Amino acid sequence: MQTTIRGELVEPYAEALLSLAQSHNLADQFQQDSGLILDLLAASAELQEFLANPLINPDAKKNVLRQLTVDKVHGYFLNFLMLLVDRRRINLLAAICQQYRALLRKLRNIVLAEVISAVELTEQQRHAVVEKVKTMTGAADVELAIAIDPELLGGVVIKVGSQIFDASLRGQLRRLSVSLAQPV
């Protein structure tokens, strides 16, 4: 139930941010700005706790956000952050930024492909993954989110929405062990 309520709060703010971005031709700028915010939040658990703490004065939160984003985000985006503080919704900031990016991808017919690889992918391998995902989904473009997991032993696992394409050595070994365990 908490997730549903949170989703109902996040969606309107993300849609409002997208509407603002489109009306001022700032969709790409806001995508960069939201990426910066997501990076800041991911890098600092203290910042997350600070912004989520209802006992901390809203002006203190605004000052910290201004200091962190001065000359790094567009003024309209900064105003949006201040609005979230005023409305006591700043604790939803990461979810709103993620939803904004998802709405923008949907609008532009871009899919997000989460790629897990045993080693760092070369540019040629990245291109091959993008083309494979385009073929699988019919999307105009693909945004890659790449993670490294040495336990895969080799190959990649690609997740697009609810679809998973497992071309890893670990996955092949698992499928082989399952088939060998089947009675003849």
UniProtKB/Swiss-Prot annotation:
Subcellular location as annotated: Cellular thylakoid membrane
Keyword vocabulary terms for this entry: ATP synthesis, CF(1), Hydrogen ion transport, Ion transport, Membrane, Thylakoid, Transport
GO MF: proton-transporting ATP synthase activity, rotational mechanism
Record Pfam families: OSCP (PF00213)
Keyword Transport: yes
Function: F(1)F(0) ATP synthase produces ATP from ADP in the presence of a proton or sodium gradient. F-type ATPases consist of two structural domains, F(1) containing the extramembraneous catalytic core and F(0) containing the membrane proton channel, linked together by a central stalk and a peripheral stalk. During catalysis, ATP synthesis in the catalytic domain of F(1) is coupled via a rotary mechanism of the central stalk subunits to proton translocation.
Protein name stated in the entry: ATP synthase subunit delta
Organism name: Synechococcus sp. (strain PCC 6716)
